[in-house]
Amino acid sequence: VLLKKRTSQYDKKFLLEIDSKIILKKFGVPIPKSLITNKSNLKKNNYSINKLKFPTVLKGTGSNHKTENGLVFLNIKSKEELVNIQKKMNKINGDILIEEMIGPISLELLIGITKDETGLFALIIAQGGIYSELFSKAVNSKELIILPASKNSIQKALKSLAIYPIFQGYRGLPKANLKKTIEVIMKISSLIEENDKNFEEIEINPLIITPKNAYAAPRLQARVEATLYSANAR
């Protein structure tokens, strides 16, 4: 996937999850292993499905509110169960995303990058996923860094969060990989810095942290000043 300038009038749009993950993967951001198919071809994709590790998640790709619209099926434990779910997929039209569920989950973060009125980009690191509500009233619920960010500044921001003790394995929870978390946040920041004219905002919620890595479950907001088209990834 490449980004190419376009001279037409600016217009904001949200990219589909599939497109978002293609872009993030190109910049080295880990994403769950996945397969893109559709209802009619689901049974024909046995070879590719066999490469996925169960449990998996099945998602319709055409809506920003997948869970509310019945377009998400979680914790699918076998290929047989996956095929049987076809009978419940009346609301899904178009492509289907099947991806491995990530675990064990140590914690979830929200990573956001937005442009202010002066044209500077600000990196926001906060509690994400289920922790957003749990720590919403905490004093240190989020940290802000003006880009470009360094590894030290990101580490300092993470250590300032109320959620930070979970990185150390709070009360028996699996430890979260701090080093990988910092590396992934740096890669997300690089995406914006290298394409500052194409992207206006990124929000990844959640960034899933495990004992071994950090994975993006993203939604990207881009300007249509940038045209996405398929090409060889670098």
Where do the protein language model's features map onto the residues?
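ATP-dependent carboxylate/acyl-activation modules
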Residues: V1-R234
